[in-house]
């Protein structure tokens, strides 16, 4: 089977809307590139950019979504985008991200691609927790700012013995980190079957019991999410999805939230939503190149 690989550079301010558009369109897969090693950086070029890069993958027969993507970009970005595309085989599709994916440390964790585990695990420094991750077709390599922000904070939360909910788990990287930090029970859910498969694979590759880390297909309305009590809810999801589900988020039985996936331009709007609908207050904020981490607590 062949796929259409579309390589895009778009303004960062429309990235949130673009990912929401891709989710609603049900594209085969996509990911955002943080560091593009194919493009040399000039010595005086800033790392922080007003643009962001995506790779989008469409099944060969999915010509409709390619047209929709072009229309979306023309309407929302005008002429301020760059697009190129090529045909690739299934093996290339599944292997494409490996070129950009090497072991690296974030806070208390070292993220290690599963294909490099034999060497990387043995060289992980003492006190650093190794996370073996193969994202497959799901979001969550750890390179993206939103994932880095959450991982950087998780090591400070004292998760031992806690019950953790991870909504929009993607590759399962955050759930794996929670389990390896001592959480007693984690429920990881995603509406994308690719995410469910990837998270399950990564759970098993890290030798985490299914009794500790349960992976299911679903969203905020998944019954166990609303029925059970949680010590922490993690949601690394775009602002549009968080906004659409704010009432369901408010009804989750937890007092502690960790949100990422919100761009700086939407931060105040999201905080206003949390204040009015969820209740409570922000206890920790951190920004990384235009993306926001928001830790939120409400009284028990």
Language model features: what each stretch is:
Residues 90-159:
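SAM-dependent Rossmann-like transferase core, predominantly class I methyltransferases
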Residues 191-295:
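S-adenosylmethionine
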Residues 23, 151, 176-179, 246, ...:
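A structural alpha-helix within SAM-dependent methyltransferase catalytic domains
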Residues 27-28, 183, 254:
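A structural motif
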Residues 137, 141-219:
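Conserved SAM/SAH cofactor-binding pocket of Class I
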Residues 3-121:
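N-terminal auxiliary segments of SAM/dcSAM-dependent transferases
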């Amino acid at each position: 089977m062949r796929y259409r690989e579309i390589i895009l550079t778009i303004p960062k301010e429309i990235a949130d809307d673009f990912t929401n558009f891709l989710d609603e369109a049900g594209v085969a897969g996509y990911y955002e590139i943080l560091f593009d090693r194919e493009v040399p950086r000039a010595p005086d070029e800033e790392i922080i950019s007003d643009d962001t890069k995506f790779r989008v993958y469409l099944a060969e027969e999915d010509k409709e979504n390619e047209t929709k993507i072009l229309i979306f970009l023309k309407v929302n970005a005008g002429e301020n985008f760059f697009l190129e595309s090529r045909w690739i085989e299934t093996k290339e599709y599944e292997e494409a991200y490996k070129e950009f994916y090497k072991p690296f440390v974030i806070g208390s964790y070292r993220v290690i691609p599963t294909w490099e585990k034999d060497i990387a695990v043995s060289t992980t420094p003492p006190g650093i927790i190794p996370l073996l991750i193969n994202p497959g077709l799901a979001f969550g390599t750890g390179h993206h700012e939103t994932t880095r922000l959450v991982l950087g904070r998780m090591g400070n939360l004292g998760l031992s013995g806690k019950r953790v909910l991870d909504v929009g788990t993607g590759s399962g990287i955050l759930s794996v980190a929670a389990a390896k930090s001592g959480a007693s029970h984690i429920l990881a859910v995603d509406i994308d079957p690719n995410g469910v498969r990837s998270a399950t694979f990564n759970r098993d590759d890290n030798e985490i019991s299914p009794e500790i880390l349960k992976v299911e297909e679903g969203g905020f309305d998944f019954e166990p999410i609303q029925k059970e009590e949680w010590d922490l809810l993690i949601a690394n999801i775009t602002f549009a999805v968080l906004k659409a589900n704010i009432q369901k988020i408010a009804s989750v039985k937890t007092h502690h939230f960790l949100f990422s996936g919100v761009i700086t331009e939407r931060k105040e709007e999201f905080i206003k939503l949390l204040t009015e609908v969820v209740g409570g207050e922000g206890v920790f904020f951190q920004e990384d190149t235009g993306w926001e981490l928001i830790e939120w607590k409400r009284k028990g």
